[in-house]
Amino acid sequence: MKLPGPDHPITITANPKRVRVTAGGVVIADTTHALTLKEASYPAVQYVPRGDTNMALLARTDRTTHCPYKGDASYFSVVADGKTIENSIWTYETPFPAMTEITGHLAFYPDKVKIEEVA
């Protein structure tokens, strides 16, 4: 486990905007409680609460990855409109202590689904 610091900063802030996630016109998530995670030089990622996500459209997959700063990630596919978008969502169900704010949140790959921030 590594801790965020000057060489690899990670910040988590409440997003004041509404965040809507869709796939093929189907709303997967819609929230005013998203968290914006900024990590080093990577693009910002919106983490959406599970409670604001239509979990009935998601199917857990066997894929897992490990981040030395956040922990082990689990993945979901979106199943909507008869189509499956493989491993389009990840989540840290038991993140490392420095990242506990993202517990219970989902992140979405912007090249697989549409993520909109609405004022």
Each language-model region and where it sits:
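Terminal leader/tail segments of proteins
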Residues: M1-A119
